[in-house]
Amino acid sequence: MNTVSIVFQNRSYAIEYVDFPATVAGRPPLVLLHEGLGCVAMWRDFPEKLAAATGCRVLAYSRPGYGASDPYPDRRQTDYMHREGRDILPAVLAALDVEQPVLVGHSDGGSIALIFAGSYPAQLRAAVVMAPHEFVEEETLAGIRAARELWESTDWPKKLARYHKHAARVFADWNDCWLSPPFRHWNIEDFLPAITCPLLAIQGRQDEYATLRQIDVIAEKTPHGAQLLKLDQCGHTPQRDQEAAVLAAISQFVAALA
């Protein structure tokens, strides 16, 4: 695993990442942004398969505190995805010498991609968001409450510790933040009208954390709309539940950007 150093608020962080080279000249780099409990390793072989399917350079990194990346000194706050999209992601892209990427974000990573796209619309080529969140639904909170019960009653802590140096904190920061009263008002829809790049939004019809309204609102509120892919027999992780369909959709989307 590779590491790169970034600086945020006068503090240095070592960030782990993987980097698969391009095999087709002229294709934009793809940067993967993981879910709220994810990291580089939890993408499994999806980055490598995506590189093979698209011919693009594909990078994936673990945000601070996830995987083997250095943790933040403070607990996660309600605006943590804003911080990742506006501050950390730009620093990572600069450190890895990535320009005009296609962001590919899953769940929290999809929300971070939208925040970046709305904050810096001239700095990316396009975005693919899979099961993103733009606002909080009761379905989301129910799923997160169920996750807490599983955490407390199964061997999930041991399993998550295989992927994260600080697994207990990863879970607590995510779960506590989403279930806190202030987070009920979390909303990033105001970023959508500023997004001008091409968008592909993917969601499973059986998503256990959200309704399809989450991607419908992207098409409604962005100036140029978005391509929507709603997958049957698919939950909150499209790249796992419907891998072939997701790889094909992203490949076609990227090829059309040329």
Sequence positions of predicted segments:
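A short loop-to-beta-strand scaffold at the N-terminal edge of the catalytic core in hydrolase folds
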Residues: 10-21
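Catalytic active-site module of serine/aspartate enzymes centered on a nucleophile-bearing elbow/loop
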Residues: 232-258
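Active-site loop/oxyanion-hole signature of alpha/beta-hydrolase fold enzymes
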Residues: 60-101
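Catalytic histidine neighborhood in serine/cysteine hydrolases
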Residues: 220-236
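Conserved hydrolase catalytic core segment
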Residues: 99-137
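Conserved HGGG/HGGXW glycine-rich cap/lid loop of the alpha/beta-hydrolase fold
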Residues: 19-71
